Structures are given as C-alpha cells and as structure tokens.
Amino acid sequence: MPGLLNWITGAALPLTASDVTSCVSGYALGLTASLTYGNLEAQPFQGLFVYPLDECTTVIGFEAVIADRVVTVQIKDKAKLESGHFDASHVRSPTVTGNILQDGVSIAPHSCTPGKVTLDEDLERILFVANLGTIAPMENVTIFISTSSELPTLPSGAVRVLLPAVCAPTVPQFCTKSTGTSNQQAQGKDRHCFGAWAPGSWNKLCLATLLNTEVSNPMEYEFNFQLEIRGPCLLAGVESPTHEIRADAAPSARSAKSIIITLANKHTFDRPVEILIHPSEPHMPHVLIEKGDMTLGEFDQHLKGRTDFIKGMKKKSRAERKTEIIRKRLHKDIPHHSVIMLNFCPDLQSVQPCLRKAHGEFIFLIDRSSSMSGISMHRVKDAMLVALKSLMPACLFNIIGFGSTFKSLFPSSQTYSEDSLAMACDDIQRMKADMGGTNILSPLKWVIRQPVHRGHPRLLFVITDGAVNNTGKVLELVRNHAFSTRCYSFGIGPNVCHRLVKGLASVSEGSAELLMEGERLQPKMVKSLKKAMAPVLSDVTVEWIFPETTEVLVSPVSASSLFPGERLVGYGIVCDASLHISNPRSDKRRRYSMLHSQESGSSVFYHSQDDGPGLEGGDCAKNSGAPFILGQAKNARLASGDSTTKHDLNLSQRRRAYSTNQITNHKPLPRATMASDPMPAAKRYPLRKARLQDLTNQTSLDVQRWQIDLQPLLNSGQDLNQGPKLRGPGARRPSLLPQGCQPFLPWGQETQAWSPVRERTSDSRSPGDLEPSHHPSAFETETSSDWDPPAESQERASPSRPATPAPVLGKALVKGLHDSQRLQWEVSFELGTPGPERGGAQDADLWSETFHHLAARAIIRDFEQLAEREGEIEQGSNRRYQVSALHTSKACNIISKYTAFVPVDVSKSRYLPTVVEYPNSAALRMLGSRALAQQWRGTSSGFGRPQTMLGEDSAPGNGKFQALNMEASPTALFSEARSPGREKHGASEGPQRSLATNTLSSMKASENLFGSWLNLNKSRLLTRAAKGFLSKPLIKAVESTSGNQSFDYIPLVSLQLASGAFLLNEAFCEATHIPMEKLKWTSPFTCHRVSLTTRPSESKTPSPQLCTSSPPRHPSCDSFSLEPLAKGKLGLEPRAVVEHTGKLWATVVGLAWLEHSSASYFTEWELVAAKANSWLEQQEVPEGRTQGTLKAAARQLFVLLRHWDENLEFNMLCYNPNYV
C-alpha cells in the first residue's frame, strides 16, 4: 500500500492527519498536501515514502519533517549517479555505491540496509519514491508534497478532479483482514510480474504490487480539504458525486469564474473525494496564460550572464544573433517566460455514430505462444472471427501473431475488402499456438514503426495469456507513442500479467479486459470495438500565429486523435524579443506549426520560416472557436484546408517554426484576473528556489540550522529571513532543492561527499552568474557549430523604441479530420506585458507556476521522444535531444528519464542513500551510445538503420536477434512476391526475414503484388474460410454450460461479406438450418418463387409434408440459370438484379435468425447485425418492396418455421408475400 512505509518490512504507517489545499486553473490542477504519519512501533526503522502518480501528474515539491530533521529531494543527472560520478568510495565510512554522504559521517544506521528499490522504465514514471532515513520510535512524520496535473474531461465537457488515494485513504471496518486479502490477491494475480513478498526481499516486485492494493488506513484521521476553482470561462456549476460540498466566493472575486470548494460535512472515509466542474462553454477552445518570473529588463540582464550568450555574441553581435541564442535557450528559460496553455474538448458525445463511416487502423496482436494452445486458442479464433466481421468497409486492418518471433498477415495494414477479409478469415482458421515463448516487445516496435495513415487512428488490440520479463520496456514504448497508438488489451486465464494488460491500456488511454476461467472473449472484444468505433476527431494539430517580435517553443510534437470525453492540451513558451530586434514590422507574423512524424527528422524546435502580414487588430481580442457539433459541421469548419493553404501561399515572408513529430501545438488565452488565494500566502518564490526557512514553523530549528549555500537566492535580491511564518499547507508550496544549493562549506572549499566536480550552474537563477568555461554543455557545443560567422554588430535598437513593449497578440488554429472532413477552430488571445506584476496579486499567488510545471514536463517528453526516434535512425544522433531534456529537467526542477530524485537531509547538509536504482535506465544508454553505435553498425543492413531487434527484446532464454517469421500460405506470398529490397536482405534467411526491411517503397510494391494475389484467390479463400468455420466442432460442446441451441451463431457470422450482406446459397441454408425451398417460398421477391416453379425436376408445388422433411439441396439464388426464366415473368431481368435480391433476402433472414435463435448473445453479434442493417438501409429494394416489407416477411418466415417444426398442418398456398 502506498504512503509512508517501513523500508525493511513493507508495512505502512497509519495516517493521522491529511490537509489538502488545491487550485484548478482552467484545466490544470495544483495540489499541495500535508500528510502526518505516526510511528507506533517501539523500534526505529528506515522510512520510505511511495507516492503513485498518474500519466498527467508531476511532482514539483517535496519536504519531510522528522523531529529536528528536514528531508527534501534534488534533481540530479541519472547518468552521473549510475556511472559512479557521485560515488562516495573516498568517504572514510563505507557505504553503498551511488549513495552520497558527507565526509566523515557515520553510516552505521544503514549497515543492515536491504537491497535497493528497483524501478523499471514504467515504474519510474508512475511512482515517486524518497528515502527519509531513520525514523525514531513514537515519532510523527509530516510530509509536504506538491504536484501539478492536467485534468481529464468527461464527454459532457465537465472537468474531473479526483483526490489522490494517498491523501484520502479509505478506512475499512476490518482493515487488517481486508488489507491482507488484497495483498494476497495482488500477488496471486501477477506472480510472474511481482513474485512473492517476503520480509527482507523489498524490491521492484513489491513496488509493482503496491499499485494493485487498495490504499486504506486502519483508523480515522483528521481531514481538511479546500479547492479553489479558476475556470477557463464562467462556471455553469460545480458538483460532487461523492460528497456534499460548500461553495464560497473569494472576497476579491470579480466574476463567477472563481470559487472556493470545501466539504459541507465531515469526511466519511469510505469513498474518494471527487469534484466535477462544469464550464459554461465546455466545447470551445480555451487559452489560458501564466506569466514568467522575470520582466523584460530582468531577463535581458539574466541573458547577458549566460555563457552561451557571451560566447555567441563574441562571434557575431548582431541583433539577429541575439534572437537566435534566445531561441536556442527557450527550453532552459521556461520559468522566466510566459506560458500559454490551450485546452479543447470537442463535442463528440452529441454526434450520431455512423458505423459505416467508422475509420481507423485496426491491428490485432495475438499471442500464439505454446501456453495459448487448447481452449484458449479456440476462444481467440471465434472472437477474432466476430471482430473481423464487425469491422467496417472504411477501415484498415492487419493481424500479427507473436511468440518468440512474430509474423504479420499483411506487409502493412490493408483496406477492409472482400479479398482481404477472406484471407484474414482463412488465416484465423489455420492459426495455431506454435510460436514458442512470449515476446511482445518486438512486434510492438514493428507496429509502431509503420507509417500512420491519415484519417485512420491506430487502434491496437492485444490478446495474451502470459507474462513477459520486460514489462517496463513494453509499457514505456507504448507510452511514448500514445499520441498515435491506442491499445485495447485482453488478458486470458489466471496466469496473465495484470500489470501488463492494464498498463498497456492505461498509458495509451485505451481499455483493458481480464477474462476469468470459462469466460467468453467475444462480448469483451465487441465492447472494446464499440469504443474504438466511436466518433473521433483525428489528425488534430494546432497552428500558432505570433508577431515577429516573439520567439516561441511549442509542445507537444505529435498530432493526436480525440475520442468522446478527451481533450487537447498544448503549450507555448513565449519570449518577447522586441528589445533585440532592429526595425520590427508590426504587421509581420510568425506561424508555428508541426511536421508529420514521417516527414523531416531534422531539429524542428529551432527551425523557422518567415511569415508575412497576418493578424489584424480586430481579430486579437475574441475567441472565434465554435462548439464541435457534427450536425453543424459546416458552421464549425471556420476555414477549410484548401482555403487556408491558398491564403498562406499569398502571404509573403512567412516564418514557420516546426516541431519534429506531427504534434498538436496549443495556445492559451489570456487569463482574467482571478481571486487571490483564500489563505494567507508567503512571498512568492519561483519553482526551483528552495524555501527551507518556512519549515521553521513545524520544527524547533532556527535559521542557523539550515546550513545551505543559498547564494543564488541572495543574488536574486530575496531576503531569506523575511518570509512570514505561516502554518499549514495553504501557507506555502514546498519545492525541490535548487540546483545551485550545496551543503554549507566555506566559500571556495569543495566537499568530497558531494560531487568531485561541482555541478554546472549554467542555469542557476542568478542574473550575474557566468557559466564555467570548462565542461561546456554538449547541446550548446553542438549547436554553436551551426552559428553564423562573426559579423559587425547591428544590434543597435531604435532610440525611439518604447521601454515597455506593446501587448503581444496571438492566434491559435485547431485543425482536425472527422469523416474525412477537415474542421477548424480559431481562438485569439492577448499575452500582455511580460513578467510578474510587482506588488500585485501574482506575488502572493501560490499557484502562479502550475502551467510552467506542466509545460516543462511536456517539453521534456518531446525531447525524450525525439531522442528515441533519432536513436532508431542512427545511434548517437539523438545526443542533442537527450542533453536538451536533461537541461530542461534541471532548469525547471521537473523529473525526466535522464534525471533522478536524490534525497537530501537539509539539517545535516548531506545526501541520504538514494535507495532507488534504475537497471534499464535511458541514462546508461546515453553513456554507452558510442559503443552501441558501433555494434549496431556491424549488425545493420543496407538501409542505414538497424534491421533487427537487439537480444534484450527477446524472450527468456532466447539470445538471438528477432526476425519476422513468414510462414506458408497465405503469408507465403511474401517469399513469392517480394520487392527487390526484400529479396536482397531476405534471400539467405529462408522462412524468416529481417524485421524492418519493409521500407515505404518496398511496402507499396508488395501491396500491389499482394492485391493481385488476393484477386486471383478470392473465390478459393471465401470457400475455404466458410467451410472451415462450418466444419469445425461446435463451440457448445467445449464451452457451453446450458442447453441453449442458439449458441452456435459463429457459422452464420462467418458467411457475412465485408459489406455486411449475406449470400443466399447452400452455405447460408446450412448455417441457419433452413432449407432453400422454404427460404425461396417465403421470399417476397417473385424471382425466388419462380426459380422453384420453373425447375425441370419439379412440376408442382411442394406439399406441407415435403416441407417437414429434409428437402434436396438447390443451387444458390445468385447462381441459378436464368434460361428457364426466359419465358417467365423475370426472363428479361439481368443477373445482377437477381443476385441483389438474393443478398437482400438472405441479409434480412440472417438478421431475423440472430434475433430469433441467438438473442442471448446479442452483445457478441450486435456490431455484425448493425453492419448488416446499415448495408440494408443503403440498398434499393426492387419490385416495389420496402425494407419494412422485407423485415415483416422474415418475421413471418420464422412463424412458419415454428409451425413446421411442430409438425402442424399448414397450407403453404394460404401464404402470399404480397399480403405481408
């Protein structure tokens, strides 16, 4: 259970008090919690604080008060920690490698410390872990933790606030019994992931288990909760589905945008605390603005003290050179600039779903390891058949089987058609669990590397029954590509890894389903398919327009798709560079947008193009976004793509800054003045500045005990002795130890307990500090080579330029696709003057940096993704992005995959043991990139990028490189019809082929050959697929526990065409158990009855007695000869009309059969029936019939069938379809 734990035993300490103060600013949440725990044990123990995080939350402050000690954390370069850069081996007392202690400090209390806590790639994202050192008996521990989060939205557009479970744990009536049961269940579920939990075996397995246990407390605790709401617009209402709440307006509130929420009654401790906020304009784009901590003049002074600026200006002192340096430093100076946050939740809930227009790329990833043999594979086959038949003609699809290796049905996703569907059904019928162990990482990498299809969101369906030994890598891979890939996972059986199945869905905003023994897969598969087929706004991008005098860094860097209830979030860091531009043009604009992921791989953050005259004054003060209502799509589409493109081409000197991946850049609108904080607030300190003196209110320490080097803070003009002494979390927000703070020593004296080389202070907050000339940043060194040669100084600005620049006007354009229709929304905003308002409300605002935290987190994620993508292309080329992520992390005190939290005992001026280790850290890969690049170059083939997967991706015991296993027909076509590039690298590999050799050109060639192959084999595949599902044993004999004869609907579903129709033939009669004669006699179409009366073998109408016996088989309606009808009524009708009527009647009868004979399994075939009905609605019914007539005739058929089954005398001649 998360919270404060005994490091050795894993036991949780009871919570005695929880005080939560929070603020919602638009769609962002800033939260500060004060958690007090009591040590009721008589023995001291090592404390470990574990705090779970969701995908949109980051920790921005942490402090723990333990008696006379204060513990905080500091962000350090993970590579230096893991490489031994901070190794204290030279310290007189022995210690564990990687832990930093002050020289001469005894570490006797840690001599019996168990092994370190191991965090894999996934756990380090979703867990905050801090070592608190020794906690004395009967001692209270107060923990202050601050987080910033992006809030989720509901389909209605409401904003949801859910208090973390650690801050408000439940109190069960029988806590001991309940907790023990929960732990046992969690361990039993995921024994392959987590292992057994025994005292002294504290490791990553236990931490993973913690995530599956319910957070509870053995007793009631003191609970206080306060939430300030600063809405993006007027609030339509605030409610709580869990508690009665009280709403009060702050004394300084100017409108209904701001309100304060508290609990009206005492907390009941039996449920979480949830608040729903309803904006008055929930489906319009909203832009919110948060100012930086420096004015324009202050930033200019700060900039002149930076080493990269000094070096750059020596080479060329022109004004353009200065703006270039500012642009390249934007990620380091995020706290100093204004941040804009764009939020947009389109109204997809009110859209009437149209299944036939459902777009998407459906990829089915099926576990074919040996453990899937037997009943599990039979279940998967039936579920896959239903899933394939449920897809719509507008989509793309592919099937991939994986085990130790993997194979794909198609070289790339194919259009859903009769040909591809027939081949897929045939492949499913022959599928076996014969591919060895379980290795899901390699096929996932192959899927993610495939090009994204415009207008088709990638929807990945994963079916597995096992576990892998690299769950963290798998989840991190999917997390990094969640913008393009959404995962719906299915876990079969008791041995499946729950963390893997749930994690795949959680990190990609999909859904997870776990099947118990004997449970059917079809209803859960259809449930997920319905979610995937919901209305979607795909290819969502944001384009920003700013004046020429600004430099902007936008995030994220990838286009995304929005399903009902999801929102678009984007950030922009805006620097006003008007002081550094000579002769600026007021009508000149810059347009910031993004590239698609398959386009340029060059640096996009700093590449730009000019933009000509753009915004007019009248467009800069309004939000012109329209609600996203598909019924009013024409009104919502403010500007089509074509018109926008033509307009752009006519403008001169456009400037466009790109971000490497296809990203949505978002911008916020100016935030109106909100109510001040309801509680007294301390002086405002920037995020990265330590506020250790505030802790004197919780301890008996005086200022002398804080022996910390706070020179950077002193240089910024702040008096550390003047902070007001306030109590409670509402009085201040804890922060992390700033990068410039080191243990107190005489100036100039170095301590060995900290690093042998002092940490670089290139990004310290002191405007006058210069960066050291040694150890220049690798990022700055690399980019400096791209600078222009020295030239004469031209930075003299116009003397008449005003000292205070004019407000910055901007515009954001949100674009997306829905049903192949381009839609666009526009919102304008005004930034105002840069920097805080001195002496104003912002100085006392505790929540004035929430957007900065989230923007820095988004920028770091962008750099991490860019580094990963560049690393796949060429090892070593991603170094610049890794260093940029590292710089941003340390400058903004936001964690990244290249940095780590290091605990610091402030009162003793020393580091505590880090406790945490990262076995698969990306930082280690940074250190070994050169050696790894040589290894990859040796194993790469012809395309300039690695063609196989490394051994670390393989299943346990498999040390070979992974390859794409291409088996016999139908996938054997790859060996027969390969492109030249494929033959070159696959000829010597036999049945196995290289993983990544399907380049874009070779894929197009294979697809052409593949399509020809399908056309030649269409009839054979259709017949084989139908016979396979008709001839296989009944599933009822395997799984059915009841005598319901409606169970076997699979044979009928297997006959459905890709369009949704059914053919009237013998296979259809066999699947429905209805003789052809009865189908034709009861058909409302004349051609069907005439075909019976005109056959040479029959000369009279069959009697009721004949109908009760098995009639002879007849050819299908769509294939019987028309020659006997030449003399009849339909003799002149073309064959196409006869085939069409056969499809109409068979489809109506098929729907009626499902409803009549398999109603109890409606949740399994509902999409199949919906597709068939959708096809019917689009057809014209001949002979003057209507669809109502067809459905009535089908219902009458089953009335007659019931009479025939009961052997009742019934005169067929009394039935006339014309009277129905």
Curated annotation (Swiss-Prot):
Residues 757-774 have a biased composition (Basic and acidic residues). Glycans are attached at N140, N650, N1017. Residues 361-529 form the VWFA domain. The modification Phosphotyrosine is found at Y881. The keyword Transmembrane does not apply. Its main location: secreted. This is von Willebrand factor A domain-containing protein 5B1. It comes from the Eukaryota. Keywords: Glycoprotein, Phosphoprotein, Secreted, Signal. It is found in: Secreted. Residues 1-18 form the signal peptide. Residues 19-149 form the VIT domain. CDD domains: vWA_interalpha_trypsin_inhibitor (cd01461). GO terms for cellular component: extracellular region. The keyword Ribonucleoprotein does not apply. Residues 796-807 have a biased composition (Low complexity).
